[in-house]
Amino acid sequence: MNEADGRFAGDRGCGDIHEPMVSEPAGRTVRGLLFGSVAECYERYRLDYPNELVDIVLRYAGRPVRTALEVGAGTGKATRLFASRGIEVTALEPDADMAHVLDRATRGLPVRPVVSTFEEFRIESRFDLVYAAAAWHWTSPVTRWARAVELLVPGGVLVLFGRPAELKDPDLFAAVEEIEKRVLLGDDPVEVHPWSIEEMAAADGLADVEQRDLPYVATTTAEEFVGRLATVSAYLKLSPDQRAGALRQVRAILPDQVDIDATVQLSLARRVDQSVS
């Protein structure tokens, strides 16, 4: 890490980290739109998803999946997996900087990046699959389930997944958690909307809800782990000096290599087929 500016030397390859400037008219920072300030680092440090994830989704679907809508595509970590199977993906990403990296990372694949939120996306057709990779908590809890159903063909599949990417060692996990309790700001309920499998199961128009885990432990360097933390919204809400100080504190307590719990957690549901036979 460069002590002068709080950045890792390796971050030079991520491009400039600029201050988030996304605000609503009232001035409240839109936390879900902070990631563009670190788009290149997001692509570099966020973990990729395993191919097995797509296998699980396709088996669950039980029928051809030709089209998909991705909610909050980011830089295309999950987009590339599905598109590489020949699925035509409409990838929604509300942040223009993230969408720029997404477009570059998916060239040559059947991907149509769209700069839009899930709520504002204009419905032109229905999809065989709607999915979100670590992004569903940015959607509106009032409309998201009904909108997902509206966007799916009868019998189509909704898949929500993510991975914790947390330190496997309980002592290190607790030590980092203690630092974060001191320096990070709490979640704003106006910005972050957690969801549960119970909500998914209770949503009108969805059935056959299942949960699957893909256990995986990744070994990474401390610098890569801290680089990933620098792309987390809770850190991006801090001022540059606060963020650099927090990351220095975390790096100081880590060994050179760490094991990460990178288990992929999936929730799957099917739109009820209301067609008349």
Where on the chain are the PLM-derived regions?
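Conserved class I S-adenosyl-L-methionine
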Residues: 10-63
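Class I SAM-dependent methyltransferase SAM/SAH-binding core
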Residues: 69, 75-120
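A short acidic, Gly/Pro-enriched loop at the edge of an enzyme's catalytic core
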Residues: 122-130
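A short beta-strand submotif of the Rossmann-like class I SAM-dependent methyltransferase core
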Residues: 132-133, 141
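A short, conserved alpha-helix within the catalytic core of class I
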Residues: 139-148
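Conserved catalytic/acceptor-binding region of the Class I
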Residues: 147-216
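Conserved Class I S-adenosyl-L-methionine
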Residues: 197-277
